[in-house]
Design a protein with these regions (language model features):
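Generic signature of intrinsically disordered, low-complexity segments enriched in small/polar residues
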Residues: 117, 127, 147, 198, ...
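Small-residue-enriched hydrophobic alpha-helices in membranes
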Residues: 1-178, 275-281, 333
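Core of folded catalytic or high-affinity ligand/protein-binding domains
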Residues: 159-310
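Charge-rich, low-complexity amphipathic helices
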Residues: 47, 51, 115, 129-133, ...
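Acidic, carboxylate-rich catalytic segments that either coordinate divalent cations
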Residues: 296-333
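Short, flexible helical or helix-coil boundary motifs
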Residues: 50, 54, 75, 92, ...
């Protein structure tokens, strides 16, 4: 199933899907009684940044899975909408505290009523049952990391593969390091200079250095620079939301990387420890809205080196990266 976050909706379809979809999300949030503020924050963010409607959540009914399926299908029989809403329900369930058997049962019944694949539900089950190794492997396999590695190999072939293995082994690569350190001398206001300043500001080792990030991951860091995102846990969630908006992957899989790393405490990345409850749901879905305007997959379809010499604002304009609307935030020194 292909899910396109930038797909345009008519006003009538938007209103219909908002009624059915938000009621479905509220059904999950009410499973334990009064919805938690964290679950409500996530639902409001979906309402405001993805559905873009004005709707009082308290006025929406709770629905049985068959009622959800009927309401959504009456809006549009395209299964993409049922796929999207099942994913949204799963994310809300994860924002609502410890995974529960009641939420899992609702999600399983909903996937059956929707007649769609239950991949999001399987992810929820793995988290609930503590299958951390399976969860990590699944997320790495389906997240943006896969495309970043493939794009790096396509751009650099075997030398880049060897350099990536060196980084993962903690071995210094002088050739790679020298190339990346040359960005410090690029013109002011250039994309390349902005990337080097991003590394310096965060005290990150340059690719190629001992302790530096593997080369594929630098594509993610370039999204921080292009989109204007910082490096707190909330900002990391926001930039991954930004990526979910433009990548040709299932947005759920992209967002789940952030959920696992910064909300559920599952350390998917080998470079940073997992954290609990550090995501900002509003910021993450605002990032997804931001990324949906971008006209190119910035992970898979460009080599940042082709653009490092250009002014940062020129590169942003080329890829239709509009101003984010808030300043990036960084961890306290």
């Amino acid at each position: 199933m292909s899910i396109n976050p930038s797909r345009k909706l008519s006003a009538n379809l938007r209103e219909c899907l908002a009624n059915a979809g938000l009621a479905s999300l509220m059904t999950v949030a009410r499973l334990k009684g009064e919805p938690s503020e964290r679950a409500l924050t996530g639902i409001r963010a979906i309402r405001d940044h993805l559905l873009k409607v004005e709707k009082e959540l308290d006025d929406l009914p709770s629905l049985q899975p068959e009622e959800m399926a009927k309401a959504i299908t009456n809006c549009d029989p395209d299964p993409e909408w049922r796929e999207r809403i099942l994913r949204g329900m799963t994310l809300v369930a994860m924002f609502d505290g410890e995974p529960s058997a009641s939420a899992l049962n609702l999600l399983e019944q909903t996937a059956k009523a929707f007649q769609v694949e239950a991949n999001p539900v399987n992810t929820y089950r793995n988290v609930m049952e503590g299958r951390m190794l399976a969860t990590r492997f699944d997320l790495m396999r389906r997240s943006f990391v896969r495309d970043a590695v493939a794009a790096t190999m396509k751009a650099g072939g075997l030398p880049m593969f060897a350099a990536t293995l060196k980084a993962l082994s903690g071995v210094r690569d002088e050739t790679v390091l020298k190339r990346f350190e040359s960005l410090k001398h690029y013109p002011d206001e250039s994309f390349g200079k902005a990337y080097s300043e991003f590394l310096d500001r965060n005290n990150f080792n340059y690719p190629g250095d001992t302790g530096g990030i593997p080369i594929p991951v630098f594509r993610h860091d370039c999204c921080h620079v292009l989109g204007g995102y910082g490096t707190t846990a909330a900002e990391e969630g926001a930039v991954i939301g930004f990526q979910a908006g433009f990548e040709g992957l299932d947005p759920f899989d992209v967002l789940m990387f952030a959920m696992a790393e910064f909300e559920l405490g599952i350390g998917v990345s080998p470079f940073i420890p997992g954290e609990f409850g550090k995501l900002d749901p509003e910021r993450m879905f605002a990032g997804m809205e931001h990324g949906s305007c971008v006209n190119t997959d910035l992970i898979r379809d460009i080599d940042p080196w082709d653009y490092f010499e250009e002014p940062l604002e020129t590169v942003r304009t080329k890829f239709n990266i509009v101003k984010r609307g808030r300043e990036p935030e960084y961890p306290a020194a």
